[in-house]
UniProtKB/Swiss-Prot annotation:
This is Methyltransferase-like 26. SUPFAM superfamilies: S-adenosyl-L-methionine-dependent methyltransferases. PANTHER family: METHYLTRANSFERASE-LIKE 26, UPF0585 PROTEIN CG18661. InterPro entries: DUF938, SAM-dependent_MTases_sf. Gene3D superfamilies: Vaccinia Virus protein VP39 (3.40.50.150). Pfam families: DUF938. Belongs to the UPF0585 family.
Length: 203
């Protein structure tokens, strides 16, 4: 099983916010996690939220193997085997029916992928979420053109050195993208390590 130190640090704080969007009275809350990484997040969420039926996804085969190992290690009956999913491709290739998901989760992907991946994520959410469903994203963001603190500014510079198409998105740009996909930015939650959770709800 792969272990990412950042995932170990942030999985608890993220869960505290995420659980507010998983109705404990619902028999099954169907969720897709896009860019699941090592599998630490989905394993942690699934253990804490037994009615969350989670479908992880990853492009990287080593990460998919790690996700499967976490599922096996914790005997997680509410997590499916990981799917190969490229969010830059049409939502019709993702393997879900329209309006079939309560929740889509995306942690630390937006700033380290090309814009087509984020655009595809939002388009997919607009089609696949049920009315009232939530797109839940986590990562560093600038707000109305202002990126703070200096460590995030430096991080953004380093990202663009690695790939000019990468970089930290502004919340206003994501809000505009959400609007075109039939969603709205409902809430923004400040998190440890200068990150944020953004909650987009489908109309």
């Amino acid at each position: 099983m792969l272990v990412a130190a950042a995932a170990d640090r942030n999985k608890g704080p993220i869960l505290e916010v995420l659980q507010q969007y998983v109705d404990p009275a619902a028999p099954k809350v169907r969720a897709l996690e896009v860019a699941s990484g090592t599998g630490q997040h989905c394993a942690h969420f699934a253990q804490a939220l037994p009615n969350l039926h989670l479908v992880p996804s990853e492009l990287d085969p080593h990460s998919r193997q790690s996700i499967s190992a976490y599922i096996s290690h914790w005997s997680l009956s509410n997590v499916e085997q990981p799917r190969t999913l490229d969010s830059s491709k049409s939502w019709e290739t993702w393997g879900f029916s329209p309006n079939s998901l309560h929740l889509i989760i995306c942690i630390n992907m937006i700033h380290i992928t090309e814009p087509s991946c984020t655009q595809g994520l939002f388009k997919g959410a607009g089609h696949l979420l049920m009315p009232g469903g939530v797109l839940f994203t986590y990562g560093p963001y600038s707000v109305n053109g202002i990126l703070t603190p200096q460590s995030n500014v430096d991080f953004n510079i380093s990202l663009k050195r690695r790939n000019p198409a990468w970089g930290i998105w502004d919340t206003s740009d994501l809000q505009n993208l959400a609007t075109t996909c039939g969603m709205s930015l409902e809430r923004m939650v400040d998190m440890p390590a200068n990150n944020k959770c953004l909650i987009f709800r489908k109309k």
